[in-house]
Amino acid sequence: MQRIALAAFLCSLAPAAFAQSVAGMWDATITYNGTDIPFRMGMSGTGANVKAWFFNGDDKEVSNAGKLENGKLVLNFDSYLAKLTATVKDGVIDGEYGPILKKMCAIHAVRASDTKSQAKVNAPSIGGQWNLQNVASSKGEKAWQLILRQNGADVSGAILRVDGDTGTLTGSYKDGKFVLSHFSGSRPALLILKPASDGTLDVSLSALHGFSEMKGVRPEEARAKGLPGPTDPDTHTTVKDPEKGFPFRFPDLQGKVVSNTDARFRGKVLVVNVTGSWCPNCHDEAPFLAQMYDKYKSQGLEVVALNFEEADQLKDPTRLRAFIKEYGIHYTVLLGGETDSAKEKLTQAVNWDAWPTTFFVGRDGRVRGVHAGFPSPGSGELYRETKDKFTATVEKLLAENQTSKK
């Protein structure tokens, strides 16, 4: 009788005593277009209260909800409308994440190893800025920027295009090359850098839109050789007639139609942001725009986001609502239509092809500036310069005498 009672007691303890915990750090890979891309993720909690986070440099992309039941792990990332589903067995996670560009991607993870025990490596110095030549751009670019920060064998940085960057790539030097990667819920990327004997870099990139090989050259050397430089994001896109402002007329999330001619915008500085909640670089820009609006709205600043989304998200913009909540957005958000319709609806824009693109309209109603793209903190000083430039433009326009809108 005592043995039966003991067995029953042990059975009652089994689910709690032997349930696997996922709390802690994990070394993971995501397979995208046949390439295994390493990244690190963290998790906490148990049962129906599991949380996970991906890293983008020092920033974290945190799941909105998650659970672990009977070895089945489910994590939701609402601001990307993505989900991670996996099995957890013997300290190994196997499953899939997505969609990323409509694809589900295999995920594999094991408990994180102790990198501190690794022997020191004498790595060549590659820190600083580089120009990347032979780029594969659909936007007419001839060069991109590569920004690297180095601490011994460890390197972090980003590739900056006219529309934005790769997110923070991190990695280290081993076997004659630097291997860096990024995955934070979006834009998976694997970057391999091989220092050449002539002081250049052989660069291989596997990312969202395929594989490419480039040559890294220091900016001063590129100028001396007459090589093309990166595209200027302040001149890449223009408008047909600055005097005519930037017209828009779209519904907000409650269905109310908002127009640039509404009285609420008259005599105000207006920042019009062409964006989409599906766009990683738009995620980079949104928190800064939210902070800028909250700081300057009492001085006469208005920010309007023209969001272009997929058809199903226009009917029920769940991802956009999560996007607004995540970044604390208090400015006006409008539904512009499907992404493919943006060009025909943005009637003033010339050479517009970057998500996001931001138009600055003065108190007089004239377009005073356009900026294509937006970098992430991974671009370092160039990220800070872009934020400073936006702030300086807004402050200058706010300081101008208020005039009636033309």
Task: Kindly give the residue locations of the regions a language model identified.
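Central antiparallel beta-sheet cores of small beta-barrel/beta-sandwich binding domains
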Residues: 20-89, 97, 103, 116-197
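Thiol-/selenol-based redox modules, centered on thioredoxin-like
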Residues: 354-406
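A short beta-strand-turn-helix
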Residues: 248-270, 293-296
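Structural microenvironment flanking redox-active thiols in thiol-disulfide oxidoreductases
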Residues: 284-327, 338-346
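Sec/Tat signal peptide C-region and signal peptidase I cleavage site
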Residues: 15-19
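Short pre-active-site segment immediately N-terminal to redox-active cysteine/selenocysteine motifs
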Residues: 268-270, 275-278, 285, 310, ...
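N-proximal helix/coil linker or "cap" segments that precede and/or mark the start of modular domains
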Residues: 208-251, 263-267
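Short, internal strand/loop/helix patches
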Residues: 249, 321-363
